[in-house]
């Protein structure tokens, strides 16, 4: 057996920085070619995010409207299909729209299995089935696809681990810059928990207030036997998924994810990762509402944490997962990381995204955390993740 790993990165405009390393890149760089204790081979595909190559205007357009998302999903699927043999373990990682890519890839595998090499010419049929013909989640099996299209796949393939940082499904298009309806063409991707997944981990940003970067949480129902962990961390989108030059805060969710994947068998070179004993709970966070997204400073969106509602006022907005009819969806196994509890109501620095330098210090509090820390109280231990 071997381990087949796909790492899907975000886009350049997720953090406003085109050069700093994300957590996806750092995980990919830390993966051993072989597992030292049992000699298991590990092969890795790293996919740069859409909008990260070409001329600047090309990157702007591609990154903003999500061109290339479909291509990345199909490319990753081809890589897995060309290398997979029964018994292999599959690990998927993603950040931002790369997380959306990784979760969509998991949905494609769950719906169609992994096409056998000699049947890869049927990938367009698998894509069509997943894109436009798939029944409601959890009401299908790969056998439905195989029968319909008379093809063959590894229909019982499983995804050992799916680790994502702050999934963005709405593509992050600045309002008025590009057609608002563009995001709807990506709505077909199945980003709910899928039956082919064994363990899913999702790191979420408490302090991301851009309306077009609202997260896509995993929501009920979850298939039997699928373990889901969704944990909230301090900071903006790039403080959780990486990508800022000042990145000490992003090391916390990176180490959390690395440990979870390692527990499921992934072999990592910890000399390429932060030392777990050196993490800084009071490291600077970032204000992502700048540049193209400066309008969000005047009309911030607050993410609901642990499904605890709170009052917003003026131009503030609250985001909670809803279905197409506006009904609240039940999220799966949300917790708050212990580092957040350690930081709350303590002085901490805030960095400017434009200059990426510390410009101020303030007591760390957040409107969406206020229901969790009433008065001088603290969170129940059951709601805290390590």
Predicted regions located by residue number:
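Active-site- or binding-pocket-proximal scaffold segments within functional domains
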Residues: 1-386
């Amino acid at each position: 057996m071997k381990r087949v790993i796909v790492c899907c990165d975000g886009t350049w405009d997720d953090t406003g920085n085109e050069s700093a390393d994300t957590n996806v890149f750092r995980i990919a760089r830390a993966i051993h070619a072989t597992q030292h204790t049992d000699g298991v081979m590990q092969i890795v595909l790293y996919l740069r995010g859409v909008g990260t190559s070409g001329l600047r205007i090309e990157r702007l357009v591609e990154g903003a409207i999500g061109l290339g998302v479909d291509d990345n999903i199909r490319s990753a699927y081809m890589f897995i299909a060309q290398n997979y043999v029964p018994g292999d373990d599959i690990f998927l990682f993603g950040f931002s729209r790369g997380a959306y890519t990784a979760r969509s890839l998991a949905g494609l595998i769950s719906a169609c299995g992994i096409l056998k090499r000699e049947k890869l010419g049927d990938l367009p049929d698998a894509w069509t089935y997943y894109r436009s013909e798939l029944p409601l989640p959890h009401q299908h099996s790969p056998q439905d696809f195989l029968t319909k299209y008379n093809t063959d796949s590894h229909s019982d393939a499983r995804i050992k681990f799916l680790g994502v940082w702050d999934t963005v499904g709405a593509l992050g298009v600045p309002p008025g810059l590009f057609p608002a309806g563009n995001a709807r063409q990506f709505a077909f991707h199945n980003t709910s928990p899928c039956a082919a997944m064994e363990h899913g981990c999702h790191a979420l940003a408490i302090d991301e207030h851009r309306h077009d970067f609202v997260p896509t949480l995993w929501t009920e129902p979850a298939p039997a036997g699928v373990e889901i962990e969704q944990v909230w961390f301090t900071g903006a989108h790039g403080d959780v998924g990486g990508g800022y030059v000042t990145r000490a805060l992003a090391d916390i969710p990176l180490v959390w994810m690395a440990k979870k994947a390692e527990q499921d068998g992934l072999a990592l070179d910890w000399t390429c990762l932060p030392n777990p004993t050196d993490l800084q709970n009071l490291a600077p966070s970032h204000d992502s509402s700048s540049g193209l997204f400066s309008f969000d400073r005047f009309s911030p969106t607050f993410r609901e944490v642990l499904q605890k509602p709170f009052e917003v006022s003026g131009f503030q907005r609250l985001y909670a997962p809803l279905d197409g009819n506006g009904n609240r969806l039940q999220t799966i196994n949300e917790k708050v990381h212990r580092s957040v509890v350690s930081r709350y109501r303590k002085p901490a620095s805030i960095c400017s995204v434009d200059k990426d330098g510390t410009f101020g210090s303030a007591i760390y509090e957040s409107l969406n955390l206020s229901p969790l820390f009433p008065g001088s109280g603290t969170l129940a231990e059951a709601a805290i993740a390590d």
